[in-house]
Amino acid sequence: MTDTPKPPRKKPQRPAKPAAPREKATLHPRNRHQGHYDFPKLIKSSPELAAFVILNPYGKESIDFANPQAVRVFNRALLKAFYGIAHWDIPADYLCPPIPGRADYLHFLADVLAEDHEGVIPRGASVKALDIGTGANCIYPLLGHSDYGWQFVGSDIDSTAVAAATAIVKANGLHKAISVRLQGNRKQILLGLCDSNERFDVSLCNPPFHASLDEAQRGSQRKWRALGKADPKRKLPVLNFGGQSQELWCEGGEIGFVTQLIQESARLPGLVVWFSTLVSKASNLPPIQSALKKAGALEVKVVEMGQGQKQSRFVAWTFLDKAQRTPG
């Protein structure tokens, strides 16, 4: 009788890697910018856009996103058609933001607030939001007020940006809903910005994510080359979609800025119910989460977002317990 041969020994299995998403990440369900843009509709609302519409390599109408003027006019058309913002312009060389991604941040933040309101998104003028680094474009207050009726205070360390944002607010008759103020101390973010009796339901921030001007320029050149790769001889601007130095970089980069924001929020724990900030790289999350733990945040949320091939996220934190956050 022969012994049955033993099966070969199996090698230990390595943990499976997470499966890559099969489809492009999609916008938030409430985002107004689903699917392809309706350029005939946009041009009807904003005729100046017609001069900038091109056919992309797939034969679809688009604009040249490597042309700052085209992006500016496109944004103006989107704001008018989707949000009722009739007047919007920013000084040359200031950041011209992609509107769908900015809107996504607001919609996901609204969901965070809804969790403390029995699943109902709080709307109207009773909701106060603080936009840290609102910029000349004032984009978050404009979108947030249009979509949810929230009241906004925007802040910035750049007096030119404050003046431009204020002009946009006044031109659209929104001065009762949106105000913009200067943070006079460039080394502070929250400290010295608000009165002792001011309270906000939520704060938001798109932090500068480079640690130096050189790093910002290298990052922008990579983006420009991706956008302009069809024409390698094309002369590329230095900074992608505009942007003043304080909009793009600061000492310590994104981690340094967000860590300071967390430290200052811990000194003003009752100023905002839910503080939040965008985080450009997932690799920056561990030191940020460590800073939040050290600061004594009671609850921290990391919310992932996706627009097409781009993944982004924000971190939200609070120093208030559920009872303190729940109205009534």
From Swiss-Prot:
One of its GO terms (cellular component) is cytoplasm. Disulfide bonds: none annotated. This is Ribosomal RNA large subunit methyltransferase F. Coiled coil: none annotated. CDD domains: AdoMet_MTases. One of its GO terms (biological process) is rRNA base methylation. Its EC number is 2.1.1.181. Residues 1-38 are annotated as: Disordered. It comes from the Bacteria. It comes from Pseudomonas syringae pv. tomato (strain ATCC BAA-871 / DC3000). It catalyses: adenosine(1618) in 23S rRNA + S-adenosyl-L-methionine = N(6)-methyladenosine(1618) in 23S rRNA + S-adenosyl-L-homocysteine + H(+). It is found in: Cytoplasm. Its main location: cytoplasm.
